[in-house]
Amino acid sequence: MLSVVEGILILVVISESVFGVLGNGFIGLVNCIDCAKNKLSTIGFILTGLAISRIFLIWIIITDGFIQIFSPDVYASGNLIEYISYFWVITNQSSIWFATSLSIFYFLKIANFSNYIFLWLKSRINRVLPLLMGFLLISCLLNFAYIVKILNDLKMKNDTVWRLNMYKSEYFIKQLLLNLGVIFFFTLSLITSVLLIISLWRHNRQMQSNVTGLRDSITEAHVKAMKVLISFIILFILYFIGIAIEISYFTVPENKLLLIFGMTTTAIYPWGHSFILILGNSKLKQASLRVLQQLKCCEERKNLRAT
């Protein structure tokens, strides 16, 4: 039986999941329509991949969490936890990779530095994306091999319990090794986002001496971009904090509140960042306003028919 606090957090997680699927589904739909019109750009490809991977990631977070909370015995056979582990690696790594690619793309497109390496990368932005794809593939293959090793070791020990029956220190070391690829992309994304914020801030200071009208419009755009980046960094950090909380649940499996709180914290990022992207991207924002306008018109027609 769940406590009141646990029940409230479960409702929050469900709400986050619904918003996440709707927000990312909208992003994916808008860019898929552009793809059908042969208008899909590099940024559109990244946003589409990010949206699709996050939808699957949300389902994995919810499915895995609810099984652990309500039916932990389902994992006793070992097969389900194996499939979920594989799927988790694919969706989590893909989501982080696309988020990192988005950060790098904006960094190379918008930032302004005189550094030779930066200028070299900026002139070869179309080659950076395939390079990151190669890193993702290597990271996924390494993690797959490591997961297979862990699960095979458990089967050889005839450990039929879904919880990893090992010392706490050993478990955390295995999780750290398993997430090395993700940590690399996470660090890279944070570095590029911080550098872009610094570049925007410096450029904003340089614009202070320009004409007032131009200065105000550019300053507003820069402040908006910095707010989006700072929000992204905060949500990204919360996502990894949530994962750490969920990992720590394995050491105290009787504390369901810890797991539910971890799920709530983890799910903030995939849905929160999707709405930040919609509000920060002019094309997505205009499309969302058109959808809201259509919904408003439909509601008005329905009210007129009712009267």
From Swiss-Prot:
The record's misc note reads: Most taste cells may be activated by a limited number of bitter compounds; individual taste cells can discriminate among bitter stimuli.
Q: Which GO MF terms are attached to this record?
A: bitter taste receptor activity; G protein-coupled receptor activity
Main localisation, per the record? membrane
UniProt record similarity statement: Belongs to the G-protein coupled receptor T2R family.
Pfam families in the record, alphabetically?
Answer: TAS2R (PF05296)
The family database entries (InterPro entries) matched by this protein are listed as: TAS2R (IPR007960)
Glycosylation, residue list: 92, 158
Which organism is this entry from? Papio hamadryas (Hamadryas baboon)
Localisation per UniProt entry: Membrane
The chain's Cytoplasmic topological domains, given as residue ranges, are 28-42, 122-126, 201-227, 279-307
Report the domain of life of the source organism: Eukaryota
**TM regions (residue ranges):** 7-27, 43-63, 101-121, 127-147, 180-200, 228-248, 258-278
* Name this polypeptide is given: Taste receptor type 2 member 10
